[in-house]
Amino acid sequence: RRVLFRSQSGWPYPMEPDKITGTDYVYFHRSGFGIQPGGTIRGPRGWNGGDYRESLKDISYPVICHELGQWCAYPDFDVIDKFTGYLQPGNFEIFRESARAHDVLGQNKEFVYNSGRQQVRMLKEDLEANLRTPYIYGFELLDLHDYLGQGTALVGILDPFWDSKGYVTPNEWRQFCDETVLLARIKSYCIDRAKNATISIPIEVSHFGRAPLQSVRIHWQLEQQPVTEYTYGEHGKTLTQTVFQPPVLCGTLKQRDYALEKNQSAGCIYLNMEDIQPDCAYVLRVSMKANGRIVENTWPFWIFDSSKLNQVSAPDESKAESDTHEAVFITSERFHAETLLNEGKRVLFELPYEDTSYDCPPVRFNPSFWNSQMGPTWARGMGMIIKNAHPAFASFPTTADGGWQWQSLIENARGLRVEKLGCDCITNLVQPIDEWNRNDKMSLLFECQVGTGRLMMTSINLEQDTPQASALKKSILSYMKSDAFEPQGQVSWKQLSSLFEMNDVMKELGAKIDDDSLSACLDGNPQTFMRLTGGYPYSFIIQTTQKHNISGILYMPRQNHREHEGELRSYCIEAWVNDTWKQVQKGKLSSSYEPKRIAFLQEVYTDRIRFTALDTFSAPGKSCFWAMEPDGWYQKEADTTANPEFKGQLPQDIFSASVINLLLAEEEETDVWKKRIKQRKLVHLEDSKQVVNNLQNVTSEKSATAEIDN
């Protein structure tokens, strides 16, 4: 018999790959000290036709990747009925009731399918990158089915009972996970025809079957993405109809033999962009016959043409003034949007990232990795639901579950919490799916009536320099200028205002903190944080350049610690008034990652606030354990005599915060916001002029400054 030895399992090697010795093979997921030097051998760094060879430079042993593919999909709550034995699905019941509370339970089947398709995209990229990488000769996929422990990791394409979830077939799975796999090195799935006359795609073969392949020809064809229709019923998503299109381009690669090996070049596919119609979705299909069976793989493409997208005549301002029926006004300023809507105009409102409420977290294209209880983040993603049959997407190709053409569009967008509007009167055109531990009901693009005005609102940056952003904006504007733009739901401007918040208010106020090491909490960014250690209470002073009417404080806990380290519980806030400190609020908070808005007993006119953290949800300097109380999880002091295992677990007294912002009185906040808009206008005026010159039937935003002045 043969015995194989390895020196460790799973965790990163604390050395460069060429320094690893004394083993028969290497099993890990990261080399070197952290990411550099060396690096990861799983995840996005090897995607888009790449690989992980730099992470394995000069290694002497074959490598197996540890726990690849921990991408999650949303839970199907029908699985609850399968638990008929001793194990009770309490976790799924909690997730279901959270979904019910956030008004998304009725979308469960859509969430399952669309998040599942997003999960499959990630798994395909991970596995193909693994197969493209020299020296990697295997992987441990975590897992084929859902894992119920450690926070509930819904990482499987099968449910906890090893049953199919219904969003990927065995044949599709074998395309990228089989003994023989066809691979392509595709740098981007979104192609700008104006900048690429020809696309070259190297094809490789990874083959570990029973015998080598002899005299094999590989065939390829580029076809328009088939149009698929589904219905949702009692048993989930059911295919109604799929309409396939004839190939646009096709060809055959040179006949070759393939050994039992990977990284075997099969040749190159060349796509002439002149032969391909833009603003369409395509599928590249590559296939061959291997030992009596057909081996096939497919990849999506979205073709755009930036030269045609930019060929838009300047706006006819006189027509815009006299014929408002077809005029569309574009703005990123809330007061300008309000004025236009009050006048009955059609408005595309692009809400900037930094002007969005802290109740609206960023959206992430990649799904949660393992789960957010073990690895919490402010930004989360589980795929999306798109009303792809809506006329707003008439010239922007998309399926209902999205695709790679959305990646750059949503990565820097905030999910607008439409549940905060207090009504269900919007048409949600692009809905990101939130992770099941939070279940926020959100939107990236929606339409509604506001008074007599018609609003299309988005948190997507449509001004970014990508062909897909230009194509989406053009498609939206074409719809908004048409007679079809008749939003049905009515929403008040006051309701919409719940989505706005000045994230950089402390910068506008010139706020400083008396300890520079704590300044991270004043940057307005919940993805950074400050951390104090020592002993309670912790006090610090925030001072502004001049006095303001202050009505409260916004506090956001640290967003990325699984144990809510340093999360504030009890506090005292004082203001410097008449040369003395005056208490303006004192109290306790509940435990959650949500922003906490602490209203003062009354508004104060001051330039100094003293913030004191009296204690947090952590036991002060004691051996501890975690316990659930009605208002959150607490670290409680442990009896180390009765429980010796707790001995030595001595946490420090820690206070942390990701954001501490002053809340201004309403009138003062409006003044600061308008001043900020003027400054932004002056900085971007020249860029705005150029943008306006390229928009058809759009009234220039240059007038917004004058309107705000008034």
Outline where the language-model segments fall.
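Aromatic-rich peripheral "rim/lid" segments of glycoside hydrolase catalytic domains that contact
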Residues: 142-209, 657-658, 663, 674
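Disordered, acidic Ser/Thr/Pro-rich linker "stalks" and the adjacent N-terminal cap
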Residues: 490, 494-550, 558-571, 579-580, ...
